[in-house]
A protein has these predicted regions:
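Divalent-cation
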Residues: 1-97
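Membrane interface segments of multi-pass transport proteins and intramembrane proteases
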Residues: 103-113, 140-158, 238-249, 268-278, ...
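Multi-pass alpha-helical transmembrane bundle typical of ion/small-solute transporters
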Residues: 55-58, 68-71, 75-99, 106, ...
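Hydrophobic alpha-helical membrane-embedded segments
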Residues: 62-84, 159-184, 255-271
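Juxtamembrane "helix exit" motif at the C-terminal ends of alpha-helical transmembrane segments
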Residues: 84-85, 125-149, 226-255, 259, ...
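Hydrophobic alpha-helical segments characteristic of transmembrane helices
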Residues: 95-147, 153-177
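Polar-ligand-bearing catalytic/cofactor-coordination segments
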Residues: 2-16, 20, 24-26, 40, ...
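Transmembrane alpha-helical segments and their cytosolic interface motifs
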Residues: 113-131, 211-235
Length: 320
């Protein structure tokens, strides 16, 4: 068999993950795990079962439909893991230093407080995303069209470029803060560890260090594709510019189509290595220069612990 053919048939894992606060979460075919570095220096490993493998429902296997549910699952589970990982960084002193208002909320709501705060935070986060990536670019593009004659595609193109610019600018600004920069280092550890596993090398710190922190099957690349594909979907469906609020509502309704297409392209990029997949992966890999950083050994150890917990008993089940 030629080296080219061998390269195409290289093992690709279904395991994916994300960086959390001082740790890494990995998700396999039937279980997930989160490994966090605690303030005392130890690694806290949390594992839980998920529906997958033979138990995977039809809507998680059907092309284009599966992307919608994978996106929603990643969004919800990812936010829960971020919240839990942040809680793990609290020390006894932090818990004792509650304000009177925090103590009152804790007394009144008890165990319900956490889910309520999570729900409110998610709603605010989604609202901010709609404002930044849907309403504002549409508003600016419509304003420009008052002075320059633009076709529908031209307005959608400007809108898309603005969305991508906001995304890159936002990630670049967040990278300036110490805490987010450390999260980006854990993001790099996640990618390097998955790459080591896919090259079927033993998962050790020294082996993981050798691999790149850039990975085609990444949330950063997925977001870029969603923003890019929306340019064409909004043009094809002739989303109205008459009312910006109505336009935003229609774009939200079209989001399942956009995410479904983006997910399938990410799957292709993760499975194959050819000129087409290199082209669709290139922008996302470039943006990963911002959203990932080189990790240290302690961060790699967390990524290894999380990934090892997700490896299925039968490795054949994990083939992409």
């Amino acid at each position: 068999m030629s080296s080219k053919a061998q390269s195409k048939e290289k093992f690709k894992s279904k395991i994916g993950g994300q960086a959390v606060i001082e740790g890494v979460m990995m998700r396999g075919i039937d279980k997930a795990a989160m490994a966090c570095r605690l303030p005392d220096g130890t690694i806290d490993l949390e594992e839980w079962a998920i529906k997958g493998g033979k138990d995977t429902p039809w809507y998680r296997k059907t092309p284009f439909v599966r992307g919608i549910f994978s996106f929603l699952t990643s969004l919800i589970d990812g936010y829960k893991c971020l919240t839990r990982s942040a809680e793990k960084q609290m020390t006894e002193d932090d818990e004792e230093e509650q304000t009177k208002f925090e103590q009152w909320l804790d007394d009144k709501l008890g165990d319900k407080l956490g889910p309520i705060i999570t729900a409110i935070s998610m709603v605010l986060g989604v609202g901010l995303a709609i404002l930044l990536f849907m309403y504002l670019p549409s508003l600016v593009s419509k304003f420009i069209s008052k002075f320059v004659h633009l076709s529908a595609f031209g307005k959608n193109l400007i809108e898309g470029i603005l969305k991508i610019a906001i995304f890159i600018g936002y990630t670049a600004l967040t990278a300036l803060t110490k805490d987010i920069r450390r999260t980006y280092e854990y993001h790099g550890a996640e990618h390097k560890t998955i790459a080591c596993y896919e090259h079927e090398e033993e998962l050790t710190v020294e082996n993981v260090k050798k691999y790149t922190r850039f990975h085609p099957r990444c949330g950063t690349s997925f977001i870029f594709l969603v923003l890019f594909i929306s340019i064409f979907v909004n043009t094809i469906f002739r989303v109205s510019w008459a009312n910006i609020f109505l336009r935003v509502v229609i774009k939200i309704a079209l989001l399942p189509i956009v995410t479904g297409i983006a997910y399938e392209l990410i799957r292709l990029a993760g499975k194959y290595d050819n000129i087409f997949t290199k082209i669709i992966s290139a922008p996302g890999l470039w943006i990963q220069r911002i959203t990932t950083s080189e990790p240290d050994e302690s961060q790699i150890e967390c990524a290894i612990a999380a990934l090892k917990a997700c490896i299925p008993e039968n490795k054949e089940d994990d083939k992409w």
